[in-house]
Amino acid sequence: VEKVMLSIKELINCSEECYAHVSVNGKEKETLYAHTELSQKYWIRIFRKKHIHVVIEKFEKEYLGPISDEAKILFETMLMNIVTFHDFGKVNPIFQKKKMGHEFHLELAPDSNIGSKHSILSSVFYLDYFLGKIKELEDRAERELLKDFAYINSYIISRHHGKLVDLEQYLNSLSGRSAEGEDLGVRARAWLENWKREVMGEDKVPKFRNRWERMLERNSEEENRKRVYLYALTRLLYSMLIASDYYATSEYMKGVEIQNFGEIEKCDEIINIYEQSPVQKSIRSYEETYYPRNQDALERETDINVLRTELFLDAECELKKNIDASVFYLEAPTGSGKSNTAMNLSFTFMKQNEDIRKIFYIYPFNTLVEQNMDSINKVFGENKEVMTQVAVVNSLVPLKERVDEDEWNGKDESEKYQRILLDRQFLNYPIVLSTHVMLFHTLFGQYKEDAFGFYQLCNSVIVLDEIQSYRNALWAEIITFFKGFAELLNIKIIIMSATLPNLEMLTENQAKTVRLVKEREKYFKHPKFAKRVVANYELLDQKITLDELMKHIFGNIGNERKILVEFIKKASAEEFYKKILEESTCSVFLMTGDSSIQDRKKIIEKIKGQKSVLLIATQVIEAGVDIDMDIGYKDISRLDSEEQFMGRVNRSAKRKGMVYFFDLDDAAGVYGSDDVRIEEKVTLKMEAMRKILTTKDFPKFYEENILPEVKKRGEEADSKKNLEIFFQEDVQKLKMPEIEKKMQLMNDNKNMLSVYLAREITEENGEVVNGRDIWEEYRQLLEDEKMEYVEKTVKLRNIRSKMNGFIYQLSENAHFQEDEQIGDIYYIENGENYFDENGILKRERFQDGTDLFI
């Protein structure tokens, strides 16, 4: 690595005269030379820890093809020295004067358009040097190919303080051909010419390209896999650069040196503790004595744990046989112990491949994140050392401290906060639990903060739960990206669900994928899973009213039963809750997207302790809610949602479960018209679909009904939907904003208001949290001008995670009178007035303007 790393002193003759950073605590200014050396140190550290050489070798083989040794060494030198050149532009005399308080060659100041900017100047320094080197190559095709990468790498440097813009926008600024008249690149080059002549005594600046069509079209004939490789490498280098720069700056400013980036240490010990847990011991004992059980004996088996154990061991065997593949599918019935199976598979990868030292567990909802954190706690909770390596990354949980309070005793607090923040920004945790949304920001977000943790994905295991919850309009793009990322970055991806589409039908990338449960029928058709719940369609003959539904439910609740009712629209759930609350003699609860994790836990605890209870809910109930009901009622939507819902009924399989389906609201309004799965012909209105729900033949459902339609839509002429156009136009040309827009998992709450309802909430441990105190703490923190930025950032994130339990999203048309507003959050002092006796939000208060005038 060091062999190709250039020394800044040999490239520029003023690196010790110019400064890169000024410290706030009276430390000496940091020279450009010192900062570059530190940045190189971190770049090399990341390179080694993450085995980036393997990524580059794979990229060269797959993307560059056969090139001369000379060109290959130059290509690698160009990549490695992105970090070397990233701050060269700080020699800018205006930067030195304005930002560093240092008078330096003011006669060579750039024009006012550039002002004190440095990133664009760094990028032309980089281009100037490497275009000169490329010129020396003999082969013209190699010269042109390497020039492409010189421009891409210089683009990365130009963006290391900002978000990722469209590559073409940057290129056009270099040639002055930008439609917006953006010509910073042209101005930067003119300044560099002058600078080289006056300061470095050099005359020439190599000629820049002034047309980009050939470069951008160069791979138009290529397969999508190569386009994903180009995107992944660009994002990886950008992520490594901003990480190295941040780590180096933190070391200078705060003295915090980062030695490891959250790799799992003492892997064997963790696996040992896992294998000693009661569940694992019983699985291993079964494996020695009975596994594999013959088909007949298994069909007669009445203990659901035996089936879970068989499935666990089947998946483990398949994985070991195919350990070199990259993408694995784990299709297993609801309630078959997928989470534990996935944990075991992650550890199996680590045992077999010592490069893999990081695990990401990724779920569709925060409730699932929380639930799986609880499972990990059950296994490792006694072991503090293991639990310091596990972190939940979302907005609901405070930032993790990976160090002992005692370690910081008497030490500089600011160093502690710096480390906590860096760990969170760069995902420096060995085991990360988070959501699909977080992962997609890391993979596709155009903001610098999004890409911070991208390099951490190299040599990791990513377990993706419930992938079918993504918009199916994105399935083809998702599997194409995932397969490319997995191959290039050595990621092992496990995709798991009870209703798993065969995504292979949607991609041209034919790299081997592995189905971990080869004999799915053995489990899906087993009475313990298939006959646990019976579906009843008597209410589906026509549209139903809420009154008719209520009457039917009251006919069922009599003899001590727990009943779950799911609506697909929140408004219907709320209306029905109010209606049935007035009539019902047993307890009634409501669970919607409004219910905080705390609220949900309380409701679940109450339900467990009662014999007769009614739970009214929205889709939040479909996954990750640990309840076991006797009877279910569900408004029909997508077949995979119906199956998920059935998983909430008769989970223990100890009695007969029943689910009634009804038709109330229009699913298109909820899931969007681009979801193939809500078309009437593939819903439970059709006899054929009812049969699939009974036989659990989801592969057939997807392969015959859904995937062909998704594929057809992806081939439509409409460029917004066309898969090929997206990869050829946006991915190949590195149109980062377009890629982010396309790969958005959900349309965010654009027109919603955040309202903070201050009240008292009782935590699980019985502690009472006062929302008014938390708001006051938040206000004081914002007003504190003296606190250091890093400490303030950490504390603000932590207080915001506490505030989430009090914040509700309301429509922009909501009527209310706030007591205070900070930023985009409206504060209401007497929040209690907005909840009923069950702690359920009374949304109608915000609709009719009665609000606080009570």
Regions found by a protein language model. Name each.
Residues V392-V403, I568-A571, V588-K602, T618-E622:
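Conserved helicase motor
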Residues I323-S346:
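Walker A/P-loop
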Residues N383-F444:
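Inter-Walker segment of RecA-like/P-loop motor cores
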Residues A486, K551-E560, E566, A571, ...:
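C-terminal helicase lobe and adjacent C-terminal extensions/tails of nucleic-acid helicase motors
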Residues R357-F380, N394-V397:
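Conserved Walker A/P-loop ATP-binding site and its immediately adjacent core
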Residues V437, D450-G484:
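SF2 helicase catalytic motif II
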Residues T499-N556:
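Interdomain hinge/linker at the junction between the two RecA-like core domains of SF2 helicases
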Residues E2-S285:
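Accessory nucleic-acid engagement/destabilization modules that flank
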